[in-house]
A protein has these predicted regions:
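Proteins enriched for Cys/Gly/acidic motifs involved in redox and nucleic-acid/cofactor modification
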Residues: 1-203, 242, 257, 279-290, ...
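Short acidic/polar active-site loop segments enriched in Thr and Asp
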Residues: 97, 191, 227, 326, ...
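Conserved, mostly hydrophobic/aromatic
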Residues: 178, 195, 231, 259, ...
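Active-site proximal loops enriched in glycine and acidic residues that flank catalytic Cys/His/Asp
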Residues: 197, 233, 261-263, 299-303, ...
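Radical SAM enzyme [4Fe-4S]-AdoMet core and its adjacent flexible, acidic
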Residues: 10, 203-225, 272, 335-366
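Terminal RNA-binding accessory module
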Residues: 343-441
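Short, hinge-like loop/turn segments at secondary-structure boundaries
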Residues: 93-94, 116-118, 211-213, 247-248, ...
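Conserved SAM/AdoMet-binding glycine-rich loop
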Residues: 75-79, 84, 89, 187-311, ...
Length: 441
């Protein structure tokens, strides 16, 4: 059968899809890029917030529309929305042939076989503890970087977040399995390994071994062929001295940390069920910058959380001005079904939430413009991702730029640059998100 895939959501979801595609290829199926050619369309969904749910439903409907020209087409919905909203999908989009929960990804080949043996409207859900945690898979990213998912689920229980209800409690992947996959990825040509989980810093806590991320970094650092190791979604509550020391002693671990703090006001943080206060956040950020000079810090904020007053929002704005994060995204609070925050008093109207998020981003725009301008005249070490055909510029990244979420270094070069290769670039211009330059002589 010809399988076409629509991939939505975060890198963790991409890894799940990579595993499913490997299973399908191993069963003798083939993948196609054109939805019109497919016998099966696999829609791997995100369902984290309302906007992601809307996008997922739009893509499901698009996939189902191809049944008009191919009545035998099968549409399978997987991922977080399948786990979270199975009844809604089945009731409102009856054209969907199967809804497969996250814990049943490893049964995807069986689902396809059953559909083509005459069964329809299938659903499959496994126990949360049985979530597949990687293993053999295809590499759905460009060949020179890949995501390594080291855990599934989360025990943090933030009051705004639906993930524990979708992905279950923390389930750390066997360390030897993580290292084995990293070795395989390096053997396939991967130069940059991006470590992901709902909370990588909690890795091993379900074994009774908090801080296991440090040991894992030590082992990953020894994998031949890897050049950069990047950590995403690190929670500030677990940025210990030991963790910082592990980042420092392992030269392949890049000076970059995605640190989602969500807010800075003590009352709001408590209502969010976060475990840091403003003073502790400032202490962690200051320590990271002192101990790892030049570190790039990215964060995520929520504006308009239930009960957020004008004074508390102003506190957030002042915090952003004070800390000057290198990368920042701010989102209007989204009330998610089956979360504590959705039932709280003091829900804020959408217009106010949107305005607050926009104001935070306006503040960050000024900070970013200054930080970008300061890099003009510097020589930076970059990894080439490829060429932009329209401009003819090569798109590269520094250690401070994670793929897809951060900016690029756009390089002009008469000589060809090659994806997966490293270069030194002299920066001669900047804009809000990107740098521009030429290969240093």
């Amino acid at each position: 059968m010809k399988i076409a895939c629509i991939s939505l959501g975060c890198p963790k979801n991409q890894v799940d899809l990579d595993v499913m595609v490997h299973i399908l290829l191993s069963a003798g199926h083939e993948t196609v890029a054109d939805l019109a050619e497919a016998d099966v369309i696999l829609v791997n969904t995100c369902g984290f917030i309302e906007s992601a749910k809307t996008e997922a439903i739009e893509n499901i409907l698009e996939a189902c529309s191809y049944k008009q020209q191919n009545p035998e087409l099968k549409v399978i919905v997987t991922g977080c929305l399948a786990e979270r909203s199975r009844s809604q999908i089945e009731e409102e989009i009856p054209e969907v042939d199967a809804v497969v929960g996250c814990a049943s990804n490893k049964a995807i080949d069986t689902i396809v076989a059953r559909l083509f043996h005459g069964e329809d409207h299938l659903e499959s859900y496994g126990a949360k503890k049985d979530f597949p945690l990687g293993g053999k898979r295809v590499i759905g990213t460009p060949a020179h970087y890949a995501y390594l998912k080291i855990a599934e689920g989360c025990n943090n229980r933030c009051h705004y977040c639906a993930i524990p209800g979708i992905r279950g409690p923390l389930h750390s992947r066997d360390m030897a399995d993580c290292v084995a996959e990293a070795r395989w990825l390096a053997g396939e040509g991967v130069k940059e390994l991006i470590v992901v989980a709902q909370d990588p810093t909690a890795y091993g806590e379900d074994w009774g071994k908090p801080g296991s991320i440090c040991e894992l970094l030590d082992k990953l650092n020894k994998v031949p062929g890897l050049e950069w190791i990047r950590i995403m979604y690190a929670y500030p509550e677990r940025i210990t001295d030991e963790f910082i020391a592990a980042m420092k002693r392992n030269e392949k671990v890049v000076p970059y940390l995605d640190l989602p703090i969500q807010h800075c006001n003590d009352t709001i943080l408590k209502n969010m069920n976060r475990r840091s206060n403003r003073a502790e956040l400032l202490e962690v950020i200051g320590k990271l910058r002192r101990e790892i000079p030049g570190i790039t810090l990215r964060t995520t904020l929520i504006a308009g959380f239930p009960g957020e007053t004008e004074e508390q929002f102003e506190d957030l704005c002042n915090f952003v001005k004070e800390v000057k994060f290198d990368r920042l995204g701010c989102f209007a609070y989204s009330a998610e079904e089956n979360t504590v925050a959705a039932k709280m008093d003091g829900q804020i109207d959408q217009e106010t939430k949107d305005k607050r998020a926009e104001l935070v981003m306006q503040i960050q725009t000024g900070i970013m413009a200054q930080k970008q301008a300061e890099k003009v005249g510097q020589t930076v070490h970059v990894l080439c991702d490829g060429i932009d055909e329209e401009s003819g510029l090569y798109l590269c990244r520094t250690t401070g730029d994670a793929p897809e979420v951060d900016g690029n270094v756009c390089v002009s070069s008469e000589e060809p640059l090659y994806p997966g290769q490293f270069y030194d670039v002299l920066v001669d211009d900047s804009d809000l998100y990107d740098l521009y330059g030429t290969v240093a002589k």
